[in-house]
Amino acid sequence: MTIRIPSGEEADYTLHLPRILCLHGGGTNARIFRMQCRVLERFLRSTFRFVYAEAPFAAQPGSDVTSVYKDHGPFKAWLRCTAADPDRSAQEVVKKINLSIATAMYDDDMRGATGEWIALLGFSQGAKVAASILYAQQTIQQRLGERAATRPRFRFAVLMAGRGPLVWLLPETSSGPGSIPMGLVDAASPSMLDSEPELPTDSTEHMLRLPTLHVHGLRDPGLSLHRRLLRSYCQSDSVSLVEWEGEHRVPLKTKDVTAVVDQIYALARDTGVLDSWC
């Protein structure tokens, strides 16, 4: 399931625009995330086309979701949220995530969109998955070089309230001893782990070096974990940071959203998506 910009003239002019693939948090869905991102999308819709992917697994919504969106189910997740959730193999999780992403992209192509896929934008569990997708892309580029050019090449990711560790999403090597870089976890692991894996002291293999923008609410109970994702899993010269006075949610006030918008435009310019401010 993908959630689209409304049909009509408003939809038509976005068909050629660079596309941002949006990944919702655990226990919500694409429709809810579209509503949560409504202000951000309004500021950026003249330059970028937002496409919302739906996670593959049924999930229980949190109280913060049901208080506002209780009538907007079914609720979905990308990963197991807790150890109480049904067990699934890492291979199954990776396969279903890849299928959800591919379906969202294919559906948008079938609606006539032609813009390059240039970025990922995720919130909470969706941010973890977005960072992990970017890490998988980085790994593929390192291994295949120019042969990886036929795959979608995301230039950067916007990570809102994302926590580590990164998840190993390469299906051909997602199981077996020694197949996962130290510091990462396989896709069968619950995403709300109380503890994170030990990080290597003599290697930076676990580090994401492609550009990321981190958006942190300063009143978010998980702020320390979000900062750990930035500091421990993302190379320092590739990160940008926006902090705002908010809880665990997507910014809605104009002053907070414009700070995020400014950094997205800056990343788009720096990565060659835009030659100048649009």
Swiss-Prot record:
Pathway connected to this protein: Secondary metabolite biosynthesis
InterPro entries assigned to the protein according to its UniProt record, in alphabetical order: AB_hydrolase_fold, FSH-like_dom, LovG
Enzyme Commission (EC) number: 3.1.2.-
Tagged with keyword Acetylation: no
Induction comment: Deletion of the conserved eukaryotic csnE deneddylase subunit of the COP9 signalosome leading to defect in protein degradation results in the activation of the silenced dba gene cluster. Expression is positively regulated by the dba cluster specific transcription factor dbaA. Expression is also controlled by the transcription factor flbB.
This protein's GO CC annotations: cytoplasm; nucleus
Enzyme class: hydrolase
GO BP field: secondary metabolite biosynthetic process
Record keywords, A-Z: Hydrolase
Effect of a null allele: Reduces the amounts of DHMDA produced.
GO molecular function: hydrolase activity
Active site: S124, D220, H248
Function: Esterase; part of the gene cluster that mediates the biosynthesis of the antibiotic 2,4-dihydroxy-3-methyl-6-(2-oxopropyl)benzaldehyde (DHMBA) and its derivatives. The direct non-reducing polyketide synthase dbaI product is 2,4-dihydroxy-3-methyl-6-(2-oxopropyl)benzaldehyde (DHMBA), produced by condensation of one acetyl-CoA starter unit with 4 malonyl-CoA units and one methylation step. The FAD-dependent monooxygenase dbaH is responsible for the synthesis of yellow pigments derived from the oxidation of DHMBA. The roles of dbaB, C, E and F have still to be determined.
Family named by the database record: Belongs to the LovG family.
Name of this protein: Esterase dbaE
Species, as recorded: Emericella nidulans (strain FGSC A4 / ATCC 38163 / CBS 112.46 / NRRL 194 / M139) (Aspergillus nidulans)
Name of encoding gene: dbaE
